[in-house]
Design a protein with these regions (language model features):
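Bacterial N-terminal signal peptides
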Residues: 14-26
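N-terminal secretory signal peptides that target proteins for export/translocation
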Residues: 1-11
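C-terminal subregion of chymotrypsin/trypsin-like serine protease catalytic domains
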Residues: 28-59, 66-67, 72, 77-95, ...
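Catalytic-histidine neighborhood of serine endopeptidases
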Residues: 85-121, 131, 144-152, 156-163, ...
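Chymotrypsin/trypsin-fold serine protease catalytic domain
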Residues: 129-215, 219, 236-258, 262
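Acidic glycine-/aspartate-rich tracts in secreted/extracellular proteins
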Residues: 94-98, 129-134, 154-159, 189-193, ...
Length: 386
């Protein structure tokens, strides 16, 4: 196995860097979330058992997106998402997706019909046409700091070691095969990334949770982070990002992404083009960290989507066949105008408007889809015009 050698001395900094793509083929592969303790490719690829049983694995589904994301790394996305209501799952907004994609939960395929995002975080909620058999409870407390966490993802293999002064201080990120894995960490702090991201949970790669200590990498976005609350594991975060890239000098020409036990002596890109030297001292290691969007900071928005708290409207009351027609009833709000669409193919569409400019009354409104009973089976959805 060839190593990426990084040689550092206090007061001077001399480095020899082997380009990552030349050496990853010789490295031990570790798939999805990365571990300090082992290179076993089968490690934690099944549901946790014992004291960690029912700690979140059962709530994770496969969110397969067709839109190219991070084109240099993968042509499509095979991410994770978490059901949080009978017809809603949550994931990361930056992995995109569309209503032409599918979400697979416990072997059953679900078809998204609508997406909800917010300017305050990297969260995206997707509504599906079908109904989930169960879904994850949300962490509603504010006591995440110092809490043990279960982490789920489908990220990269572990790459080659990053060796500093003869010590393996981390591993580069390799390639991914989208295998789901689980690991453990501890929430070290809550921090705010500002407009568009908001509060995130910070977890460091410092080995404080034993052999299951993990970091996240490319492909882990959208995976859930769970915290135990009164014996119940609740969804507390959605994987967003990790520290890096790193470099041996203050340029980006030889930068690399890595999970670092100790980043001391390396440069880290803190903002695009801005490299900051991590102090190389003997006092304490400087582990890299990963960040997950904080659920508890976004509860008002989440509940407004999954509970329709934006108003009592946009909830389907029922569809009844009356003769050869279908009668679609739905809740409305006053001073709002609606439209109703239908499709015979919820996966590929297209959706056709059967009626528009339906005035809301503050109660149940019924509209008619003429001759629907003699047509192929249809799906309906309601939209807000104003």
């Amino acid at each position: 196995m060839r190593e990426m050698g990084v040689t550092s001395q206090r007061g001077t900094f001399v480095a020899v860097l082997v380009v990552v793509w030349l050496i990853t083929a010789n490295a031990m592969n570790v798939r999805a979330v990365l571990f300090q303790s082992t290179g076993d490719p089968a490690y934690n690829t099944n549901a946790p058992t014992g004291a960690l049983a029912e700690s979140g694995w059962q709530y994770e589904g496969f969110w397969s997106t067709s839109l190219e994301v991070f084109t240099n790394h993968y042509p499509v996305g095979n991410w994770l998402g978490t059901p949080i209501a009978p017809q809603f799952f949550i994931s990361a907004a930056h992995i995109y997706g569309s209503t032409n994609d599918v979400f697979v939960f416990r072997g059953v395929t679900y078809h998204p019909v609508a997406q909800y995002t917010t300017l305050d975080s990297d969260l995206a909620i997707w509504q599906v046409a079908e109904t989930f058999p169960y879904y994850a409870p949300l962490y509603t407390s504010s006591g995440e700091t110092n809490s043990p966490a279960m982490v789920f993802g489908r990220g990269t293999d572990r790459g080659v070691p990053v060796v500093v002064e003869g010590l393996t201080n981390g591993w580069t990120w390799g390639v991914t095969n989208w295998v789901e894995r689980w690991g453990q960490s501890t929430v070290s702090s809550v921090t705010n990334f500002g407009l568009g991201i908001g509060d995130v949970l910070q977890c460091t790669f410092d080995g404080d949770t034993g052999s299951n200590t993990c970091d996240i990498s490319y492909g882990d976005s959208g995976g859930g982070v769970f915290i135990e609350n009164d014996g119940v594991w609740e969804l507390a975060g959605i994987n967003y990002s990790a520290d890096g890239p790193f470099n041996v000098d203050a340029t980006s020409s030889n930068s690399f992404n890595a999970s670092m036990i100790d980043a001391g002596g390396l440069y880290q890109e803190v903002t695009p083009g801005d490299w900051e030297l991590q102090p190389a001292t003997n006092a304490a290691p400087i582990p890299s960290a990963f960040y997950s969007t904080r659920i508890s900071a976004n509860l008002d928005w989440i509940e407004s989507v999954i509970n329709f708290d934006v108003g009592p409207d946009l909830q389907m009351d029922g569809v009844q066949i009356n003769g050869n027609d279908a009668e679609i009833s739905f809740a409305t709000g006053s001073n709002r105008v609606y439209y109703v669409e239908s499709t015979a193919d919820v996966v590929n569409g297209p959706w056709s408007t059967i009626i528009s400019n339906v005035p809301g009354t503050g109660g149940i409104v019924t509209v008619t889809d003429a001759n629907a009973a003699s047509s192929p089976s249809r799906y309906y959805r309601i939209g807000l015009s104003q």
